[in-house]
């Protein structure tokens, strides 16, 4: 939590109470899911049996942003491992230290070297090289829309499937039957949680007209 706080300039209390526990819970979830992986059979057609099995995709290139680097990296790493894949992770150049420590921790408890790899550098150089690498089978990026367009264009040359989670600009909508005090608390947390640097931040507030004056006065 301290390394993430120093790199990303995020509140230590928020990281220690939310993002770090979330990262641990993500690994718990996928560890439990590993035991449930099995083939599926279907008998909906007479004299036919359909069998579905899952196979690893291979190597995933993962790009994570600075504002929740450890939590989002944990989600990508854990899912890769659970489904039998390896990954090359490029964290934001502004917040790489906690991710490096996480990978060292994973290897210290027995994860084979080379399953989870980290490369550091600027997106325009290291990220571009990773997005066009011939040995990459999947690409996942959490970040800005303009970055996603560049990655998608680069991946197209290799026909590499991509997965994006992109920036948002969400609104809190307050109706006249809402508890005003609770709505204000929720709007404040939504707008300024994680120092306001989060893709689900409530950057706008839409209030029903007949309670607008009361809401604004209380806000």
Model-based region annotation:
Residues 1-48:
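N-terminal Rossmann-like NAD(P)+-binding subdomain of aldehyde/semialdehyde dehydrogenases
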Residues 5, 63, 117, 140-142, ...:
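Short beta-strand segments
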Residues 33, 63, 119-122, 142, ...:
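Conserved residues at the C-terminal ends of beta-strands
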Residues 40-113, 137, 181:
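Conserved small-residue-rich beta-alpha loop and adjacent elements
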Residues 49-50, 117-137:
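A structured beta-alpha segment of the ubiquitous adenosine-cofactor-binding alpha/beta core
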Residues 60, 67, 122-129, 143-150, ...:
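Beta-loop-alpha module in the N-terminal Rossmann-like domain of NAD(P)-dependent dehydrogenases
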Residues 138, 146-219:
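ALDH superfamily catalytic-core signature
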